[in-house]
Amino acid sequence: MNHLLEFYGTECPHCVRMHELVEKLEKEEGIKIESLEVWHNPENEKRLLELDKEFCGGVPFFYNLKTNKWICGETSYDNFKKWARGEDFNQEE
């Protein structure tokens, strides 16, 4: 199992924009992120709710299982890359 998780909704425009950053990160840095659709998959939705703990309350939601840090919504590519690497990042960006 990958330690970086992306929770998204198929019809979510913010999720579509952030998934472009996921693909860029995977291509440029070789960092893999497990993508989990939650609007049409009850098992993935349950996992989201377990990890989210009302931090975000929606998607896109990104969770790093190694650092227990998350990103809610959209963020910049540089901030996203720092989160994925386990570096200090701006959780409010």
Language-model segment annotations:
Residues 57-58, 63-93:
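Non-catalytic, surface beta->alpha helical segment in thiol-disulfide oxidoreductase systems
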Residues 35-39:
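Residue-level recognition of beta-strand->loop/alpha-helix junctions
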Residues 1-34:
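Local sequence-structure signature of Cys/Sec-based thiol-disulfide redox active-site neighborhoods
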Residues 13-14, 42-43, 78:
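Short alpha-helical
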Residues 16-20, 46, 75:
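Generic recognition of short, well-ordered alpha-helical segments
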Residues 41-57:
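Short Fe-S-cluster ligation motifs
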